[in-house]
């Protein structure tokens, strides 16, 4: 017990990821005067957000700012925006970058976490396990691998680095890897029209990212009829793909769905349902998607937006209790199931809900939702 008290007094809490949730967690720890180190794999804070910086969020400013972070920032003279729907770039510039600056050298950039365990204890060992600090193995962009000791670990690394493939069975379709140069797994920045104008693009997916991409391409097609767009859904019918419209809990999201339906009805977008990709082949500079039922689609570009999944590989030596379907903490799985809930109907969760059998280890943010696409920044802050 004496050793554990010493450890808690001396060692920092390590937060993995300097995205919105990781920075917010750090702000709460600073407010409680607890030492904290934030490890960010990217070259800048909020590196994942920067990759979709051109995309506009459907949450308003007040829902995108954590309370403890705001208190930390207000001490510097910062003023919180009160209305509007920012892009990812605006979120960084106005809030996330100033928050990272306020946290200062507590953040280490270019620090990729490759493993988390207990000092001198692998996953099997019970004896004295809870009395040992965590060991966090770090592979920096420059220099040799090192490890840190921590009193607690908060994994806020998100899911951005592990997108789902085009294959309908959750695995890459046959030939998908070989055709990787013709496929992208993020929402492209359509402000650069060069790669899409005058081409045929297939978008695979039914979520909000897919809707956002389809809308951008449809607007391009409206200006340039030589641009064609096909929207592929795995499900047999469109169902709730277009969202709740005026009844949507998130008005901006509802508006996206309404516009998407209008574009489909107007013929700017060709909607294909029940298309489950089994194989991807090349035909010159084009990709040919082959469905399980034998149908084919030929495209100049394929944008795969089928969701994300958590990277659990570096947590293999920890004792986790995750839902077998969602790969989320079991206590919250029923509340975030996308078959039942949408983003706006998910209740806030607390530390007790996110705790794991490994004491003092927590999954937070988008990663705590596993494969469920219903996470909102506001829910994470709460």
Regions found by a protein language model. Give the residues of each.
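FAD-binding beta-loop-beta segment adjacent to the flavin cofactor pocket
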Residues: 57, 324-362
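A conserved FAD-binding loop/helix module that cradles the flavin
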Residues: 350-382
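Glycine-rich dinucleotide-binding loop and its adjacent helix/turn
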Residues: 88, 155-223, 229, 326-335, ...
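Feature captures the FAD/FMN-dependent oxidoreductase FAD-binding
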Residues: 79-152, 156-161, 278-288, 301
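Conserved Rossmann-like nucleotide-cofactor binding loop
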Residues: 21, 44, 160, 209, ...
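Glycine-rich active-site loop/strand segments that organize a redox cofactor
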Residues: 42-94, 174, 186-190, 229-251, ...
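N-terminal Rossmann-like FAD-binding beta1-loop-alpha1 element of flavoenzymes
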Residues: 11-38, 210-220
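A Rossmann-like FAD-binding core segment of flavoenzymes
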Residues: 111, 115, 219-316, 320-323
């Amino acid at each position: 017990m004496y050793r554990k008290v010493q450890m808690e007094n001396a060692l920092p809490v390590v937060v993995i990821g300097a995205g919105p949730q990781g920075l917010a967690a750090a702000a709460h720890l600073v407010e409680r005067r607890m030492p904290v180190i934030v490890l960010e794999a990217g070259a800048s804070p909020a590196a994942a957000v920067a990759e979709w910086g051109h995309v506009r969020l459907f949450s308003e400013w007040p829902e995108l700012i954590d309370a403890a972070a705001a208190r930390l920032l207000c001490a510097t003279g910062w003023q919180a925006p009160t209305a509007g729907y920012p892009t990812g770039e605006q979120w960084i510039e106005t809030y996330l970058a100033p928050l990272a600056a306020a946290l200062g050298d507590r953040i280490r950039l270019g620090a990729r976490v490759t493993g988390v365990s207990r000092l001198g204890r692998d996953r099997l060992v019970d004896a004295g396990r809870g009395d040992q600090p965590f060991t966090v193995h770090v592979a920096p962009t420059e220099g040799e691998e090192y490890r840190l000791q921590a009193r607690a670990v908060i994994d806020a690394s998100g899911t951005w680095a592990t997108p789902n493939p085009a294959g309908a069975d959750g695995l890459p379709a046959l030939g998908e890897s070989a055709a990787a140069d013709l496929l992208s797994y993020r929402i492209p920045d359509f402000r650069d029209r060069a790669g899409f104008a005058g081409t045929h693009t297939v978008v695979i997916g039914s979520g909000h990212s897919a809707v956002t991409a389809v809308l951008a391409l449809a607007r391009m097609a409206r200006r340039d009829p030589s641009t064609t767009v096909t929207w592929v859904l795995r499900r047999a019918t469109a169902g709730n793909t277009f969202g709740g419209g005026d009844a949507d809990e998130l008005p901006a999201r509802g508006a996206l769905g309404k516009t998407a339906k209008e574009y489909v009805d107007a013929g700017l977008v060709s909607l294909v349902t029940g298309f489950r990709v089994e194989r991807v082949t090349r035909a010159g500079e084009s990709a040919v998607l082959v469905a399980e039922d034998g149908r084919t689609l030929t495209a100049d570009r394929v944008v795969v937006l089928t969701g994300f999944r958590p990277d659990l590989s570096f947590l293999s030596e920890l004792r986790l209790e995750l839902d077998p379907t969602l790969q989320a903490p079991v206590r919250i799985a029923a509340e975030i199931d996308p078959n039942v809930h949408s983003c706006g109907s998910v209740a806030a969760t607390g530390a007790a809900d996110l705790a794991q059998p490994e004491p003092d280890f927590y999954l937070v943010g988008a990663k705590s939702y596993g494969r469920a696409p219903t996470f909102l920044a506001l829910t994470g802050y709460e």
